[in-house]
């Protein structure tokens, strides 16, 4: 898992507002980016750092669940609360070994602590049934890989309920 920060010239206003409402203080927005492919993960991290302040990466869904406090049932509750409070958005690849991004989405949406965190699914495959299944299960958005800066802007607009 890797966590890095950077300065922002613009923030995802809605996520920032929601983050401020739920957490009551101004701190960096935190995006958890999950992808098993190192190159894709680094690309997503870089694009998000341009638009957001902080990105944590995970190489698979199981690592993401561990980070979110949903992996090991014996984790200390303070660590769980700490990480949950910091995550403003989860962006995950769909197709990963062990656990898919869709399965990660379902786990997040089943969690009382995490269900309000927006989840964006990415895939290099444009399969309408897969896209619809993810959106119906609570994904905020489904994005085609490889991600581009314009996609991050589209994501920001979508989160602000703008028309793309």
Curated annotation (Swiss-Prot):
Residues 30-160 form the Response regulatory domain. The modification 4-aspartylphosphate is found at residue 93. It is found in: Nucleus. Its main location: nucleus. Gene3D superfamilies: 3.40.50.2300. Induction: By cytokinin (BA) in roots. Keywords: Cytokinin signaling pathway, Nucleus, Phosphoprotein, Transcription, Transcription regulation, Two-component regulatory system. Two-component system major event consists of a His-to-Asp phosphorelay between a sensor histidine kinase (HK) and a response regulator (RR). In plants, the His-to-Asp phosphorelay involves an additional intermediate named Histidine-containing phosphotransfer protein (HPt). This multistep phosphorelay consists of a His-Asp-His-Asp sequential transfer of a phosphate group between first a His and an Asp of the HK protein, followed by the transfer to a conserved His of the HPt protein and finally the transfer to an Asp in the receiver domain of the RR protein. GO terms for biological process: cytokinin-activated signaling pathway; phosphorelay signal transduction system. GO terms for cellular component: nucleus. InterPro entries: ARR-like, CheY-like_superfamily, Sig_transdc_resp-reg_receiver. Belongs to the ARR family. Type-A subfamily. Functions as a response regulator involved in His-to-Asp phosphorelay signal transduction system. Phosphorylation of the Asp residue in the receiver domain activates the ability of the protein to promote the transcription of target genes. Type-A response regulators seem to act as negative regulators of the cytokinin signaling. This is Two-component response regulator ARR16. It comes from Arabidopsis thaliana.
């Amino acid at each position: 898992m890797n966590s890095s920060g950077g300065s922002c010239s613009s923030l995802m206003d809605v996520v920032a507002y929601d983050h401020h409402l739920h957490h009551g203080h101004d701190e960096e927005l935190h995006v958890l980016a999950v992808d098993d492919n190192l190159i894709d993960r680094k690309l997503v991290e870089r694009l998000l750092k341009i638009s957001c302040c902080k990105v944590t990466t995970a190489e698979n869904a199981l690592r993401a669940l561990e980070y979110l406090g949903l992996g090991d049932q014996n984790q200390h509750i303070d660590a769980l609360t700490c990480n949950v409070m910091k995550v403003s958005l989860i962006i995950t690849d769909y197709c990963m070994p062990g656990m898919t991004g869709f399965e990660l989405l379902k786990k997040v949406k089943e969690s009382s602590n995490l269900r309000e965190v927006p989840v964006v699914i990415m895939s290099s495959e444009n399969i309408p049934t897969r896209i619809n299944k993810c959106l119906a299960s609570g994904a905020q958005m489904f994005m085609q890989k490889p991600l581009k800066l314009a996609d991050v802007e589209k994501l920001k607009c979508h989160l602000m309920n703008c028309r793309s």
